[in-house]
Design a protein with these regions (language model features):
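Gly/Pro/Ser/Thr-rich low-complexity, intrinsically disordered segments predominantly at protein N-termini
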Residues: 1-148
Length: 148
């Protein structure tokens, strides 16, 4: 449900703009180089929500290189992976903005890439509207993400 709300709000905002939103399953090949074949890339991730603003990164197998925005919804089984492993992968790959969405605590942490490292940018909970920093004037209504 959180994914559907996030994708819906982003889709409505991005309508007619150059960026595109993709829900999971959408494959991202983080460290692919120009000369690599897609099947040779070993760092594959499938974020819950992905926003790509550079159409040249898109092909029929997904996204080649770092997307602009990634949102991950925590679950008990993925919590450590999303907060540590993926956090570090996305940071190293150059994903400009990373949202960690916790449906248990009904909260969102927003990290923004600053000089190659993520800096905690924002925190929000039910009733808040959080700014998507890489998209001008884009706000996500968390009361729609975490309905009562």
């Amino acid at each position: 449900r959180a994914v559907a709300s996030l994708v819906g709000q982003l889709y409505a905002y991005l309508n007619g703009k150059k960026c595109e939103v993709y829900p999971s399953p959408f494959t991202v090949r983080l460290f692919e180089q120009e000369e690599d074949r897609p099947e040779d890339v070993d760092t594959l991730v499938e974020p819950d929500v992905t926003v790509v603003c550079d159409p040249s990164k898109l092909d029929n197998t997904g996204c080649k290189g770092a997307p602009d925005l990634v949102m991950e919804i925590l679950s008990p089984s993925t919590q450590r992976h999303d907060k540590l492993t993926k956090f570090n992968l996305y940071q190293r790959a150059g994903v400009r903005e990373y949202w960690i969405v916790d449906t248990d605590s009904k909260s969102v942490q927003v990290f923004l890439l600053d000089d190659g490292r993520y800096a905690a940018k924002d925190f929000g909970t039910v009733g808040d509207k959080l700014k998507v920093n890489i998209l001008e004037n884009c706000l996500i209504d968390l009361s729609q993400v975490f309905p009562n």
